[in-house]
Amino acid sequence: MNIYRTHLCNELREEHINQEVILSGWVYRKRDHGKIIFVDLRDHYGITQLVFNEADNEIFQLISYLKLESVITIKGTVVARDSSTINTTVSTGLIEVVVNHVTIESEANLLPMNIASTQEYPEDIRFKYRFLDLRRDKVKHNIILRSKVIAELRKSMENMGFIEIQTPILTSSSPEGARDYLVPSRIHHGKFYALPQAPQLFKQILMVSGFDKYFQIAPCFRDEDARADRSPGEFYQLDMEMSFVTQEDVFNVIEPVLLNIFSKFSSKTIHKEFPRISYHNAMLYYGSDKPDLRNPLIIQDVTEIFRDSQFNIFNSNIKKGMVVRAIPAPKTANNPRSFFDNKIEFAKTLGAQGLGYITFNDDSSAKGPIAKFLDEERLNKIKSICNLQTGDSVFFVSETEDKAAEFAGEIRTILGTELNLIEPDTFRFCWVVDFPYFKYDKKEKSIGFFHNPFSMPQGGLEALNNQDPLSILAYQYDIVCNGIEISSGAIRNHKLDIMYKAFSIAGYTQEMVDKKFNSLTRAFKFGAPPHGGIAPGIDRMVMLLADATNIREVICFPLNQSGEDLLMGAPSEIDTEHLKLLSLNITKKS
């Protein structure tokens, strides 16, 4: 028999009444009723109410002074609760255990946070005492949810014939674009390993090696700043790659996997469609390459309506090559002036010059700072293209195309939120496809890759030879859910002539490519199959499923926003002898 417990703290029921039991756990709550002390004993599985009677003075005194979160083992008799104390919110709510023996396994110090409270504590306290924070129901449930999601993902991949393969953690610097975490070599002085930003090259080499379907729950390391949906340091993704597939094949594999996960672990409404939105249309109609389809507002381009109009500010901008975007605001025509002024001020905080607007009032008249500069024909065109009704308003932003998209997208988001237009308790997915292959860097005055340099350009070598590089699209794709990018992938470029040409446009010689990506180019010289893949982010998926607003809520031991591990004290200084062993010298910043 287990000396610490005969039952778990969620197991005892009416059928156990009069049985002698042994339980172990943490002292969760204490209620002193004078001659009786009630204790809620908690373990990983649940809670059982314990009863300590004054008649057993030694035990009674012991428990009366014991601090919360101390660990105890008790022996006692299961009895039925009085009808007035029955608790239907817990599985053991019909019984309690009258204690006749207690062993203190470990006594707790005074707590820096109340485990039983729903009070929000500062992150520095929570992360420093993460072992306490993880005892709280909400955090614990998030971690358990994460475990179940990963188990289900593995099951799905194995059922589809994927093989799980672990790729190296110590590798060379990768091309993903973020900063690497570097590890100095003790043996090879002056040389460094890098922690992988993603298993990109390894999984492609696995396809060249003849494996048909690969996956792993892959740790990825990027020296990036924290955001609400991005943890600094490391994250995990369901990394997968397949040989002899098209973009459609990848879509057909991953969509059922995600739908299964979201259906299994959430009670929210799940829209099973994955509409496909080109990158161009995402930026035009949603002002973001991560469109939140729960928001029904659609941005429209109204540049041509304002061209040669009497509104000189926009007309002048258009002549300089700028655009005008319209963001509808339903049923706001009668809102107070402060509503519109607040949006203008918000736009200015984003860096916009300002924000125009028109209201279409109940008397069918158009009002606002811009309305008087537009004739009836132009006003009607705006109403038509923006699908406006009487009582609606519309905001306008005029900037360069990229800034107009950004500002309009932010206005769309804040309007959707303030006007309660966001569809509640639902998940809406979409694909963003047809990303540009190249981009122009105004600062460097050069062409570079827009995203993944190893993706296949649409049109192949012919497009690279004959098209304007900035017009070429890539076989790259993202999955977005509720405005959060949860996955990114691509059909890979498996042909060396196309790869060399693509890199040459981005300023790399063949020798530079061979040196930087030697493992991949060598492998491609020995027969490379067409291949592609995708990598849904596990942290972000669990964040959505847990309805958390911050990704750190679903990571067991997260870094804080400054990239510090307050529990373990990392990063930390290294002693001089260790630095000498690695041939390193630290130069203090002045």
From Swiss-Prot:
Keywords: Aminoacyl-tRNA synthetase, ATP-binding, Cytoplasm, Ligase, Nucleotide-binding, Protein biosynthesis. The keyword Ligase applies. ATP binds at residues 222-224, 485, 537-540. The keyword Aminoacyl-tRNA synthetase applies. It holds the Pfam family tRNA-synt_2. It is found in: Cytoplasm. Its EC number is 6.1.1.23. The record marks 33 as: Important for tRNA non-discrimination. Residues 200-203 are annotated as: Aspartate. Signal peptide: none annotated. It catalyses: tRNA(Asx) + L-aspartate + ATP = L-aspartyl-tRNA(Asx) + AMP + diphosphate. GO terms for molecular function: aspartate-tRNA ligase activity; aspartate-tRNA(Asn) ligase activity; ATP binding; nucleic acid binding. GO terms for cellular component: cytoplasm. Aspartyl-tRNA synthetase with relaxed tRNA specificity since it is able to aspartylate not only its cognate tRNA(Asp) but also tRNA(Asn). Reaction proceeds in two steps: L-aspartate is first activated by ATP to form Asp-AMP and then transferred to the acceptor end of tRNA(Asp/Asn). Belongs to the class-II aminoacyl-tRNA synthetase family. Type 1 subfamily. This is Aspartate--tRNA(Asp/Asn) ligase. It comes from Ehrlichia canis (strain Jake). The gene is aspS.
